[in-house]
A protein has these predicted regions:
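Basic, amphipathic alpha-helical/coil surface patches used to engage anionic, phosphate-bearing ligands
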Residues: 1-293
Length: 293
């Protein structure tokens, strides 16, 4: 019975249809007004062509809506994010161009997440890089998997509206892991967490942190916008502290939670491959990925 529920959740990951039931939440969280939405989309499209600061792959309504939602329908801010998104893709083609999408299952459980998606929390993504063995594949594969995860996630109108939280679990991180985190890699990860992606990041929670990892965070801090600092929370090894920010009902058992609807990115990719449709394949290929049968 529970597996059946999980399969329904996995299949829903490919849903790109607007949900009328989310419109009230979209107004509260994104300042989205159905009566003026089309006007905002037109203004953004006009700004793209008039300013000529970027050449996005798409300018259709559904694509532009992602950027408007994450910037609360303030058109100039949405345009600025779109410019950053296009520049990031242009400067980091190695993260997606010619990348075998299904080959990214190799990262296994270095990323995890819940699929409960409650309106007050959104999607929870968990970074567990301590579970990655640097001798198996380079750190760039983790970044590639993170970028693919973000691109696939923002296809869902639900996640565009609800956004989500990130838990960075440093259990198992050693100096061998830290040695792979160059400034370039740190810059890429920070950009994928919302600086250059149309992702609504509510908060970041660092757990299982110790002073020995100060270098780890110094690398990232350089690239984090000052305005985002208030949304970063350090919990040490205190799960109770984490639970003060995220309801245990939304957390998986390893953090004292009761949410059973969680999975690793390795399984997530396998299920996407099982349930994908022609529209998904076409979009991912247009983004530069190799999508095998």
């Amino acid at each position: 019975m529970y597996q059946c529920f999980l399969d329904i959740a996995f299949e829903a990951e490919l849903n790109t249809k607007e949900d009328p039931e989310l419109m009230e939440i979209a107004y509260e969280q994104c300042k989205e007004n159905v009566a003026t939405r089309a006007t905002a989309i037109t203004e953004l499209r006009t700004m793209i062509f008039e300013r000529g600061e970027c050449q996005p792959l798409r300018t259709d309504d559904e694509f532009l809506l992602r950027f408007l939602r994450v910037r609360n329908f303030t058109v100039p801010r949405a345009h600025k994010l779109l410019v950053r998104y296009c520049k990031f893709r242009e400067d980091h083609k190695h993260l997606y161009q010619g990348v075998d999408l299904w080959g990214l299952t190799k990262v296994k459980d270095a990323y995890e997440g819940t699929m409960l998606d409650r309106p007050d929390v959104g999607r929870i993504s968990i970074f567990r890089f301590g579970r990655w063995d640097p001798s198996e594949f380079p750190v760039e594969e983790l970044v590639r998997a993170g970028m693919a995860m973000a691109e696939i996630g923002v296809r869902q109108p639900k996640l565009q509206i609800l956004g989500g939280c990130v838990i960075v679990d440093l259990e198992g991180i050693t100096l061998r892991h830290v040695a792979t985190l160059t400034p370039a890699v740190a810059y890429q990860i920070v950009n994928l967490m919302g600086v250059s992606m149309p992702c609504r990041l509510r908060s970041v929670h660092i757990i299982n942190y110790s002073w020995i990892l100060n270098t780890f965070f110094y690398l990232f801090k350089r690239f984090i916008p000052a305005a985002a600092y208030d949304n970063i929370h350090f919990h040490g090894n205190d799960v109770k502290s984490l639970q003060q920010h995220i309801d245990p009902e939304c957390l998986p058992p390893q953090y004292g939670g009761t949410c059973r609807c969680h999975t690793s990115i390795g399984i997530w990719f396998k299920k996407l491959r099982q349930y994908r449709d022609e529209e998904f394949d076409r979009e991912m290929k247009n983004l530069g990925y190799i999508v095998k049968e």
